[in-house]
C-alpha cells in the first residue's frame, strides 16, 4: 500500500518541478530568444526601409541583430568589456514614441519628465548585466561600435533589450528599441 502512495507523491513532485522549469522570468512561458530574434530581424529590416537616418555607415551584427547607425565618427579607440562608459541617450519605440532619456530637456519636451529622477550622464560598465552596474545587453553590443565623441543610433532587438518584461509602462513586451546615443567617453 505504501508503494502506490509513494509513487503518486513522487509523480506529483516531478510534475510540479518540471512545470516550474517551464516558467519564464516573469511567470509566463520560457522566453523564446531565438524565435523573437528571428521575428525582430524582419521587423528591423522593415523599419530601416522607411526610417530616414543620416549616417556615415551602418553596422549590422549578424549574431545579435543589433544595428548601429554611425552618424558622427568620434575619435580614438572603441570601448571594450569592463570599461566604464559615459553617454547620453534617448530611447524610442519604432513608432517614434520616446520612453526614456537621460536628457532633461528631451524628457520635458516629450512629457516623460520625472522630478524624482536625476538627469545626469548615463554611466555603465560595458559588458556587465544591469544588476552589476551595466545596461541592457544591446547597449554593450552597440556602444562597442562607437568612439569617444561619436553619435549614432542603436537599434536593439527585443532579446537584447527588455524581452517580454510586463512591468515597463512605456515599453510593450517584445519591443524593438531605438536609441539615439552620444558616446561622451569611457575609462
Range-by-range predicted roles:
Residues 1-4:
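Positively charged n-region of N-terminal signal peptides that target proteins for export
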Residues 11:
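Flanking scaffold residues of small Cys/His-coordinated metal-binding clusters
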Residues 14-18:
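C-terminal motif of bacterial Sec signal peptides marking the signal peptidase cleavage site
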Residues 19-187:
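Cross-family detector of peptidyl-prolyl cis-trans isomerase
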Amino acid at each position: 500500500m505504501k508503494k502506490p502512495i509513494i509513487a503518486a507523491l513522487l509523480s506529483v513532485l516531478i510534475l510540479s518541478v518540471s512545470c516550474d522549469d517551464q516558467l519564464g522570468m516573469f511567470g509566463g512561458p520560457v522566453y523564446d530568444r531565438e524565435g523573437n530574434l528571428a521575428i525582430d530581424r524582419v521587423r528591423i529590416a522593415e523599419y530601416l526601409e522607411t526610417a530616414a537616418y543620416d549616417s556615415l555607415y551602418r553596422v549590422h551584427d549578424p549574431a545579435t541583430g543589433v544595428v548601429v547607425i554611425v552618424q558622427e565618427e568620434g575619435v580614438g579607440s572603441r570601448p571594450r568589456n569592463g570599461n566604464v562608459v559615459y553617454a547620453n541617450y534617448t530611447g524610442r519605440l519604432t513608432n517614434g514614441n520616446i520612453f526614456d532619456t537621460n536628457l532633461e530637456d528631451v524628457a520635458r519636451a516629450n512629457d516623460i519628465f520625472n522630478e524624482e529622477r536625476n538627469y545626469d550622464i548615463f554611466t555603465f560598465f560595458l559588458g556587465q548585466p544591469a544588476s552589476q552596474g551595466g545596461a541592457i545587453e544591446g547597449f554593450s553590443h552597440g556602444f562597442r561600435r562607437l568612439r569617444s565623441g561619436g553619435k549614432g543610433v542603436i537599434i536593439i532587438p527585443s532579446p537584447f533589450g527588455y524581452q517580454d518584461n510586463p512591468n515597463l509602462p512605456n515599453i510593450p513586451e517584445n519591443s524593438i528599441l531605438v536609441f539615439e546615443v552620444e558616446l561622451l567617453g569611457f575609462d
